């Protein structure tokens, strides 16, 4: 199981546009990657509503690799330009225990 945590900060005045784009991304993953992305959850910070966090889990390395190569993810990369205050912070984790 591969886990990814990504933080995205909205550019000034772009919070609503970014949120809409990220919600669209969740819908595309749900529609096109069912069974590969076992968790793809979007959150916003309680302390800073311009800060968004994705919590993602993938069934395998192949599923994770395929996610980045989908047409909807490639299109989203272009859409996010101008909506972010900087580069997303992305960290990858490997699950070692859980219930």
Model feature map: region roles:
Residues 22, 68, 77:
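Short, flexible helix/strand-to-coil boundary loops that buttress conserved ligand/catalytic motifs
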Residues 14-38, 72:
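Short amphipathic alpha-helical segments
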Residues 32-34, 61, 70, 87:
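Acidic-histidine catalytic/liganding microenvironments
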Residues 16, 62-65, 74:
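Alpha-helical elements of the RecA-like P-loop NTPase motor core of helicases
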């Amino acid at each position: 199981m591969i886990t990814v945590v990504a933080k995205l900060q909205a550019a000034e005045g772009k919070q609503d546009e970014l949120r809409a784009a990220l919600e669209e991304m969740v819908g595309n993953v749900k529609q096109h990657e069912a069974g590969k992305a076992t968790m793809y959850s979007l959150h916003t910070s309680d302390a800073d509503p311009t800060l968004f966090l994705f919590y993602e889990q993938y069934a395998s390395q192949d599923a994770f690799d395929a996610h980045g190569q989908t047409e909807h993810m490639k299109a989203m990369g272009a859409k996010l330009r101008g909506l972010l205050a900087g580069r997303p912070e992305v960290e990858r984790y490997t699950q070692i225990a859980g219930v």
